Amino acid sequence: MTPRSIRMAGFIAGFFVVVFWAAPGATTSATLVPHRGIYSIGLERAEAGSGVVGVEGAMIYKFTEGCDGWTVENQTLMRFDYEEGRSLDSSWSYVSWESKDGLRYRFRVNQTRNGKPGEMFRGTATTPGDGGAGQAHFSQPSRFEVTLPPGTVFPTRHLLALIEAGRSGGLNFNRFMFDGTSPDNPYEVNAVITPLRGAVSGQAAKGPLPEFQLHIQYRDDGIAEALLQDYGDITLKLHLSKVEALSRPEC
């Protein structure tokens, strides 16, 4: 089994999300708190055939706000321990900037494995603002373009819309989202929202299986307190161990 990347506000793959929301029924508009969070990473579960016996690591997630956009920085370090004593060190970094009007997006992704360069993606994306199709331009690892389906949004606006759905009592949320973390973008994200941990119905089993399932426990200010990433053969757990509020700009 190869190492997986932990991605927040840089979600991957046409996947299924279960959101545990702290404050359904709120009437004010969703806002995100600029912050820097440190998450511990560990192995929640591993099937016998996965070959994985242990995972440990940390993720540093930084969300900042400017007058015209948001910046997300994610740096993840993980060590995978395998049967027969093998191990692998993996690092993954992601930096993005997204305009508040939802029209422009820049991204940069780097991965290393045992210190050797791995995947690298860089590029920009735009949407027309009228709900029509957008366009993504990758400059690395090679130059190519991807058409974004009508209604595609970028990560921060996707998170804001997800929070709005949770606060208004919505139970299901489905939308295309582009984050630039792989050439397979954009991804169709299917979310089920519940105010109670563990109160998940059997809906996840219907239809095509997603690449993985992501369970997120959010605070009312949009900060994730705990996450589970279930890839089928292994499940990784993340817990918020430290959070620091950051200032907002005076615009």
Residue ranges of model-derived segments:
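Bacterial N-terminal signal peptides
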Residues: 10-21
